[in-house]
């Protein structure tokens, strides 16, 4: 009678099925890791570059790829039969699932590479110099801000997404200083706007 009870359930003595071992699995388990994302192949679908992972799996392990596509096909058929169609699938791809890194955004270089320098009046006879566009040349704005503050012995701060404000009128010297420090910024790409109101 006791033997019947122990054989009938795969659970432990407390009745917890989580601690029971899989009966059809051979131990130690052999796990197949993806060559693209270095995770087990079951987790590739949660990575942002799923297409690359699937291509790698199809090329190197076609048997596993066939198993994976067979497992995923009932889910896709159920979604289409409910009337969602391809619009629902695209909407699902846009939303980030819980966990994971989300989609990796590609940098777009549509902004022209141009540095603009302007002198802005502050109070009475005081001015600040505004430098915009250094980020289009892949220049770290924090590093540039520290460099300007040290070079001109004044206060400098990063105020906008691509804007550095230097306390003082340095429009004459700053063009030469920028070209000395960052040679990739050529003379044609620097524009002096002169005195501009805030």
From Swiss-Prot:
Domain of life of the organism encoding this protein: Eukaryota
Modification sites for Phosphothreonine: 86
Gene Ontology BP, a term: translation reinitiation
Cell compartments where the protein resides: Cytoplasm
Main location: cytoplasm
Gene3D superfamilies: SUI1-like domain
Keyword Cytoplasm applies: yes
Domain SUI1: 115-182
Biased composition, class Basic residues, residue ranges: 95-110
Phosphoserine PTM positions: 20, 73, 189
Role, per record: Translation regulator forming a complex with MCTS1 to promote translation reinitiation. Translation reinitiation is the process where the small ribosomal subunit remains attached to the mRNA following termination of translation of a regulatory upstream ORF (uORF), and resume scanning on the same mRNA molecule to initiate translation of a downstream ORF, usually the main ORF (mORF). The MCTS1/DENR complex is pivotal to two linked mechanisms essential for translation reinitiation.
SUBUNIT field: Interacts with MCTS1 (via PUA domain); the complex regulates translation reinitiation.
Protein name: Density-regulated protein
């Amino acid at each position: 009678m006791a033997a019947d009870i122990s054989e009938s359930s795969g659970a432990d003595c407390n009745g917890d099925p989580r601690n029971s071992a899989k009966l059809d699995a051979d131990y130690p388990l052999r796990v197949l890791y993806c060559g693209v994302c270095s995770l087990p192949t079951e987790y590739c679908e949660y990575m942002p570059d799923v297409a690359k992972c699937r291509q790698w799996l199809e090329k190197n392990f076609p048997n596993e790829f066939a198993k994976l596509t067979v497992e995923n096909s009932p889910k896709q058929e159920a979604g289409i039969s409910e009337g969602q169609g391809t619009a629902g699938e695209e909407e699902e791809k846009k939303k980030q699932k819980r966990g994971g890194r989300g989609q990796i955004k590609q940098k777009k270089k549509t902004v022209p590479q141009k540095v603009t320098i302007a002198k802005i009046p502050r109070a009475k006879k005081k001015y600040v110099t505004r430098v915009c566009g250094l980020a289009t040349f892949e220049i770290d704005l924090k590093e540039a801000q520290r460099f300007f503050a040290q070079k001109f012995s004044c206060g400098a701060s990063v105020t906008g997404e691509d804007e550095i404000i230097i306390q003082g009128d340095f429009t004459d010297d700053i063009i030469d200083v920028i070209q000395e420090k960052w040679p990739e910024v050529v003379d044609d790409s620097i524009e002096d706007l002169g005195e501009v109101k805030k």
